[in-house]
Amino acid sequence: MDCVSSNCSGANAMQVLAIDVGGTHVKILASGEKTPQKFVSGPKMTAKQMVAQVKKLAAKWEFDAISIGYPGPVLQGRILHDPHNLAPGWVRFDFKKAFGRPVKVVNDAAMQALGSYKGGSMLFLGLGTGLGSAMIVDGFLEPMELGHLPYRKATYEDYVGLRGLERYGKNKWRKYVFDVVERLTAALEPDDIVLGGGNVKQLEKMPKGCRQGDNANAFAGGFRLWMKEDFHTNFAGGAHRR
């Protein structure tokens, strides 16, 4: 099933607004709508400014609840650190009060992983500024921070994130991506591996056993966060009502 086109409404038919917060743009889509909207983010955008822009763009949309994919660590639905590429002030921001609706916050990689999931055990790796990661096993989501694990002389994301791409060039970077995927596959033994993120397009081919993700799956993941009957998500590691 294509969750974006069908809106993943499920049996509960809840109307959801999914917000994908990025370092350069914020993208939004609501259940029942076909065309995502976006606006520029950047280092000067605060959480309050983001909310104001979203309200403006989504003024004519109807929705009951909100999902936010956040570009940083989230624990128990609470943002742990301000994002590197946005203005400070996100950690204690009350999104529920600001929007006037129930809100669930997850790491952006976790939200895209939810939208990419087809069953069994799936590892999602987001090749972006860093290395986003999440694992789903039989419908239970576990956001991860694999990018910070030691690798060679630094960490995984130092080699396969944007810094690695810029430092080593495309050819070496691709080799590191293949090596990292092979190592994580051996360690975690997933049935399915999805490579997403903005830099996945820099790969000439997919590593063995991998499929390419679609950034639009972040919206599908946002819709799925509020589904109750056909998708069981373990929010202990990454989602909670705020």
What are the residue ranges of the model-derived segments?
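Glycine-rich phosphate-binding loop plus the immediately following alpha-helix
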Residues: 26, 90-93, 97-112, 121, ...
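Short secondary-structure boundary segments
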Residues: 70, 127-129, 197-198
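Glycine-rich phosphate-binding loop and adjoining helix at the ATP-binding site
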Residues: 42-55, 59-67, 72-121, 158-160, ...
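Short glycine-rich, Thr/Ser-proximal phosphate-binding strand/loop in the N-terminal lobe
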Residues: 4, 8-52, 140-167
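Glycine-rich phosphate-binding loops at beta-strand->alpha-helix junctions
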Residues: 184-216
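Short beta-strand scaffold segments in enzyme catalytic cores
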Residues: 26-30, 72, 114, 131-136
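Residue-level signal for inorganic ion chemistry
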Residues: 28, 68, 195-197, 222
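Short glycine-aspartate micro-motif
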Residues: 16-20, 65-67, 122-126, 194
